[in-house]
Amino acid sequence: SGSSEETQAPAADTGDAAQEAETSEETDAAEADTEAAGEADLSADSGEIYIFISSPEYADAINTLIDEYKNVAPNVTINYETTQNDYPTLLKAKINSGDVPDIFSSTSGMEIDTYREYSYDLTGQPIVDAMDDGVAAAMTSAEEGGKGCYGLAIKGNYFGLIWNQNILDDCGISAPETLDDFKKACETVEAKGYQACTTGFMEWWVYKHNVMDFLNAAAKANGEATADMVAKFQAGEAKIKDYSVLYDNWFDYIDTAVKYGDDKPLETDLSGEEQAFAAGNTAFMLGQGAWVEADLLAINPDLKIGFGGYPVDADPADCQVVSGSDQALHVYKDSKNLQTVLNFVNWWYTSEYGQSWFTDVAGVVPPIKTDKESAYTIIEQGKKSVEEKGSGDLSICYSTDSFNQAFGEAMQSYIAGTTDKDATCAQIEKDWHEIDGAAK
């Protein structure tokens, strides 16, 4: 990425890039007529694409996609960089220095508008016709009244609790659907000689995944929509203590996960969590979803996986799998190689290889319109759970990832014992108001 900083067009010249953006839709429409930006059209394409995104769990799959694209467009060079820790901070530093990646990521929802001034509106591109309607809805601008398509997704998704079905069978218990059942299950599993939980609590982003069902249940108990409750916290008009599911149940859940979890929870990252669960001696894997199954089965092909929502209170109906597209990839609207970037993303969503990549390589819930069944248990059980119990609200998207990171760090301080529950709540409330209240 260093070289792209040196060759970045100065601010005074961005008019040319904007003009290129205006004309690119016409160019692309012509290409769409011939095999939807298909492979035959791309062999003469050239240029560099700099991708800087989060989600390192998809690094292998994306590298496979890039390798395949090399066969299609041999003169296009794709420089791909990924990180999870401090991604929002690193991205903002790149944007401020003028080194804006050609493709960058954020959460969907609120952050679509946060980064809209840098994002190309994909409306009219072949990719939008192929995109799942629910995913496309997450890419619209709330400030523009639900218009535009300012991103694409690596995946739709399912978030929830993963368990080792063999361990639950051996212990004679079913998957917990209430918080009390979860605590009892952890006791039973440990008494039988297994580890109950592996948490990944070193990663800030696992907390935002864990908390979604709690946010939804807290709002429901108060007779309000989750989005409205989150907006109150952002405005500085709500306290965690006002919501028993957050003040009591959430911390009870975290305490239970730590008590029955990894020896060093704050040193257990995604890889450590995957290794611990795949070893076959741990009952519950927290904070994850459909994206980990391929890694788990690569380590232990005999693993029997179960998947459902998080147990958050006394009502099994609130134990819901959360589905949707939580992440957006943005195309930089003033990219020097805008057409080359558009050709790549259109190929990804419309070519036969690109469409099969989602299920066959990445093992994710496809963000495209498709009837193809998945070979992955989490995706199929997630789909079944949503059909039976409905989907939980993708509530992390009502906040920015800058807040979500601060939330994760506040919870890490709580687990470390450096802040108590009330101080942690005060910090979360302060961050929600200062980070996301200011972002509105």
Place the predicted regions along the sequence by residue:
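Hinge/lid segment of periplasmic solute-binding proteins
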Residues: A32-D41, T107-G160, S174, K183, ...
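Extracytoplasmic/periplasmic substrate-binding proteins
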Residues: F52, E111-I112, N249-K336
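Extracytoplasmic "Venus flytrap"/periplasmic binding protein-like
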Residues: E68-V135, N166-E177, F284, I299-N300, ...
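Extracytoplasmic/periplasmic substrate-recognition and gating elements
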Residues: N71-V72, T77, S97, K147, ...
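A structural signal for short loop-to-beta-strand junctions that line the ligand-binding cleft
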Residues: A93-K94, D102, A130-N166, Q195-A196, ...
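Extracytoplasmic/periplasmic solute-binding protein
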Residues: G146-I154, K183-G236
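Conserved C-terminal helix/tail region of periplasmic/extracytoplasmic solute-binding proteins
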Residues: D169, E387-K440
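Glycine-centered hinge/linker elements that transmit conformational signals in sensory
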Residues: T188, V230-L266
